Amino acid sequence: MKIFFLIYFVLTIPVFGQVFNGMTLFSPAQGGGGGGNFYSYLVDNEMNEINTWTHPRGPASMPYLLPDSTLVYPYRVPTPSMNAGGTGGGISKYSWDGDLLWDHVISNSNYQHHHDVEPLPNGNILVIAWEMKTAEEAYAVGRQSIDNSLNVMWAEAIFEIEPVGSDDVNIVWEWHIWDHLIQDVDPDLPNYGVISDHPELQDINYGSAGSNGGPGGANGDWKHLNAIAYNEELDQIAISSRHHDEIYIIDHSTTTEEAAGHVGGNAGKGGDYLYRWGNPQAYGRGNTSDHLLDDQHGVNWIPEGYPGEGNLILFNNNYTNNSAVFEIVTPLNDDGTYAISEGQPYGPGEPLWLHTGNFHTQMQGGAFRLPNGNTIVTDCDDATIFEVTHDHEEVWSYDHGAGQVFIARAQKYELNYLG
């Protein structure tokens, strides 16, 4: 395998300046995720192999390296119960030596894992999943149309799972968007209200309920969540919706019962949105000039001690004719809520820091702040990873250069990260 690796990466072109000295982790994938073996690579700045893991199935998103050297790998199952862009279904844990420690599949008639996961400090894992809803269930809560021949609507759920044994889980917490809806079309149906008065709720009629095209054919994909991140200090979760051009923050300090309602948790709001940003027209506020996100991916908090700590950073896939990285300062209050003026959208009105250039991807993509203030960026479609300074100087780059291959997102870890 090592000989293969060295040949495979002959096209690597590192550029050195103020580059952060760390270890980069990524999992290249072919579209569809089937056929042959797949690999996760951990490399240094000169693309020397530190470790490689082999997988029988292609990645759904990016892998995660834990401080104990365990690799968490979300992957695409062969026959998903719900199939659209970003379909996953399986989550594996591997030892440093490549032994499979645990493997669990979430792909059934009710739920289908897709895209991202987020390992938690307590050893549990947050998982994004589509939740199957029939047209009748959608109409019963005020949905006006179903936009696919399957006559279904895929809602979204988040599960916190505790790995058990070699292939089982305990579900220790869960959240469902279906518990936080609003509609303004029928006062005789549940959740009736004025959309713009309730930015904490999701308009059931915003956006299309799936389509008859795209990867996998007809689907009920409504919001298309594509990334999830966790902030331990706040005990909050950030998620990204490509189809609605928004990012959201919800409270994780709630019980599962509280997460299904509108009160409880540290912020006192239950499972309602604490914050949302990118497209305030989705909740009846603002105008087209406030619509700042377009098909974004990869939202995450900048860690404590890093330049910009506590801010959110994300990959905005469509910005003018390219893609861009946004860093935003959220209007966080001391009590864990987020400030918003009556009738106005959530701030900020613009990013604190924005990096763009000659890169553009329609699929996935991501950005992470590094300890020295640099940012590592992944152009998914071009299978390219690069590092830029705060002043927009590109100091390191890598082009996978392997044809019909993409890299969802890459992360870079400190050299002393592993315990």
Features from the language model and the residues they span:
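Sec-dependent N-terminal signal peptides
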Residues: 3-14
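Short linear sequence motifs
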Residues: 1-2, 168
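Histidine-/acidic-rich catalytic cores in large beta-rich domains
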Residues: 17-419
